[in-house]
Structure formats: C-alpha cells, structure tokens
UniProtKB/Swiss-Prot annotation:
Name this polypeptide is given: Uncharacterized protein YqeJ
Superkingdom of origin: Bacteria
Major localisation: membrane
Location(s) in or outside the cell: Membrane
Underlying gene: yqeJ
Alphabetized UniProt keyword annotations: Membrane, Transmembrane, Transmembrane helix
GO cellular component: membrane
Bilayer topology annotation: Single-pass membrane protein
Entry's transmembrane regions: 8-28
Provenance organism: Escherichia coli (strain K12)
Amino acid sequence: MIDYKKNLLFILVFISGFILFTVYSYTAEKMIYNETCTANWVIFNDQGRANLTIDFMYNKKNKTGTVALSGTWQQGNRESKSIRRNIEYTWIENYDTAHLTSKKVNKFEIMDQVDDDRLAQLIPDFYVFPEKSVSYNILKQGKHAFILSIGNRAIMHCAR
C-alpha cells in the first residue's frame, strides 16, 4: 500500500513538473521573441503641430510586427484632429540598419480624422500606405532603449 502511494506521488510530481516546465517555456518564448518599445514624436509642419506616440511591437523570430500610431494634429487655432492606426510590417536587418516594409495599414475610421495625404506630408509613407518602406539605423541605449535615426539625424528615442 505504501509503494502504491509513493508511486502515485512520484507520478503526480512528475506530471506537475512537466506542466510547469511547459508553461514556463511558452511564457519565456513569448517574452523573448515579442518585444515592444514606445517613442513620442512631435512634428512641426505648415503652421501646425503633430503629437504622436508610436508603439513598435515586433517578433524577432518571425521578423514581423505592428506599429500602433496614435496622436493629434492641430493646424493654427483650429480644433485638433486625432490620428489612430495600426501598421502591420515585416523587416530585414543589415548590421545596425532595419529596413521596414508596411504590409497593411488598419485605420480606426472613427478615431483617425487626418486624411492620408496630409499625414504623408508629416511622416514617412510607411506609416500611411501599404507596401512602403522606411529604413532606420538603430543604436542601442543600454538594455531597454534605442535611438532610431535616418542617416546621422536621430529621429526618435524608443524605450521598452
């Protein structure tokens, strides 16, 4: 009878360990391969100002991601208009340069009030139209941040 209880306990401990290992492996993989960073961007153009927040979400393993672009555009004393869209993208790397190509631009019609032509004057076409590219030089800033630049000009600071 005691051997039966020992064997049952051993099997339960083994199954519990296997389940914990599986859950840990799955969560660790999600944390390793899915990364995010957020950048704030203020752009002045044509007597107006855009305040944007850009959330880069990406998967290192699949080299895919989504950019959540949100913010406001205000021209002169007019009422501000909101911007909200998600850009699905793929990328390739070449040393410290990432070449991003937009695959699909999902506008939140109720919230996105700035027309595409106006937005294309403010930010790269990658954020506005599908199948457009942008290249960023990426310089790591410690363990949790990046400087994204085009050429020698720093464009934004992206922090995790």
